[in-house]
Amino acid sequence: MNSRTKALKITLIYPPGEQKISEPIPPPNMTIAVLAGALIESGHEAFQIDAEKDWFDKIQYSLTKKQTALLYDKDSVGAYVNGKAAKELAVKYDRIRTLLLNGLAVKKSDLVGITLVDIRAEPLIINFCALVAHAVKKEFKAKTVIGYRGLPKEGFFYLMRRYPCFDYGVYAHWGEKAILEIVNDISGEKAALTGTVARKNGKLRNYPGDGARRPYAPRPHYEDHILERYKADDARIFSSYNSDFPFAKKLIKKDKEFLVVPYAFELTCPGACAVCENDNKLRSDMKSTDQIIDELSKLKSRGVTGIYFVNSSFNNHYKTAEELCDKMIKYRLDLKWFDCANLRVMDERLLDKMRAAGAVKLTFGVETGSQRLLNYVNKGITVETARKYLEYSNKIGIWNHIELIAGFPTENARDIAATLRSMDNIKDFVDIYTLNPFYLYPYSRFYREQAKFGIKVVPYPPLQFMNFFYPLYRIVEQYSLKFEEIGGLSWEEKNAQIIGSTKAIAAKIDSIATFRAIGNEHLYLLMCLYDKLGHGNKELIRKLVRILTVKFKPYNLNFFMDDFRTSFSKQKDLRIFMPLKDTLFLGEPEPGAVPDVKL
């Protein structure tokens, strides 16, 4: 740390959201752990608050129904934090503010940071953040920062104009660097703010990103008190499922606690697929295998039994993946793990080593069953390759998860039919599906090389005129550019085709596996069953999972889900941004307004 900069006290908060994931027991958030690690290494004190867990475990029950209604009221919350609420209403919000601070056990801090990772356009997330930020400014005179690289700067301008309790908004790719510069700024030291919107002298100012990226994948610093809350024995795990059967009772031993945490060793990707925003010209941020083993060993020593890798892929580099597996086996890490796997860099030998090194579930980007489309998007695999390795992975006992995309540019009825046939051919080897309608992302190869792929992007008006927070519950970071197929479908026609393709593939998944198999990973359940029964009993594990997941209780619900007929609705997603002039923040269009989808 710069010797001129005094040590500050910084609190980092992961806020609650209603519709983030539906796991009965999710892993802890990695973002605040990464930021905390960087701050501690620079000599500051960092405190982590898992407000997501605090809210669903206890805080929500400390509020009356009227107080909960006020917390969800976007207009009243906005008036309160802007000092425009009527006196009687302000008193009510003061009480809520006190309940939140006490429930979260927020300490006096110089800076309070709230991550917006996974943000959806929902009142709970945004109002919670605004009320907490307002509270710490009132109680501690603290500065506040919100941040997430998935939200463009225009989104931060929008939020910070509505809520003056936010002092900084970080959209930089390298969040650790950005928050350290903010620390310098509030310390009165020279600061090179980067990828940050800052409130200066009552006005908002943008400090563009400098393009800097972290040299290596981030290292999380999880606090013990948070890890303790994510430990679960088999009894707790089974209690969230359809487990009132003799076989389940026989499996419960209460002799071990399970703990899954996120971790990454490579976020960059050498692939050149047209779909994602990856820039394969970037230098790899992969850690050395020795560093990975060292960091995983330290996590194990703290009670971690499973790793939820958030890499771009476990095996982007064959030799490195093989070396890592060999070391995981040699040093007897005995960690169960989950990760994405690259079909381009795969063979049976590597799959065997991944299994021996602890792989429980692998996610494969199959994308489509049309060889024409696989070639078109430069996926680098064949339909037969995907089938071959899915079959072998299943044979050796790995839980297979595939990702599919509906509505690629130029996709036609023959391509959809090929995908449906392929799904029939691999259904016996697949356990979980993820299905997404096609999004044309800014900075993807589709965007950068439009002529090559036979499309033409229809430009948006400037993003400052678009509503990032409409409709209600949209995933804020996910939006598609509109495009036309050159010599083919117009945007309106293509949009309808994407929706139709999504419906067709979703119906196929429902027919062969039911909607229960879409998206629900059941990390703790899988880790527990594989720990007890082993890879050699996958068929038994599959039967048990099918029975146990007939109903289950997500961590953020007070009831068991048992009707999954409407659980998949991505075909209804509004993938594009709508103009501010026609839409309400966190709501429906203005009365009488007709959003112009042809923009």
Model-found features: residue ranges?
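Glycine-rich, highly charged phosphate/nucleotide-binding loops
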Residues: 69-104
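Glycine- and acidic-residue-enriched helix-capping/strand-helix junction motifs
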Residues: 20-32
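Flexible glycine/acidic-rich beta-alpha junction loops that bind and position SAM and/or redox cofactors
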Residues: 19-22, 54-59, 151-157, 271, ...
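Radical SAM [4Fe-4S] cluster-binding motif and immediate context
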Residues: 225-400, 421
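Radical SAM enzyme core and accessory elements
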Residues: 1-13, 19-22, 41-45, 101-110, ...
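N-terminal [4Fe-4S]-dependent radical SAM core
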Residues: 2-4, 8, 19, 202-262, ...
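Structural recognition of alpha->loop->beta junctions
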Residues: 158-180, 353-362, 418-440
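Glycine-rich beta-alpha loop elements in corrinoid/cobalamin-binding modules
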Residues: 31, 35-38, 45-51, 91-218
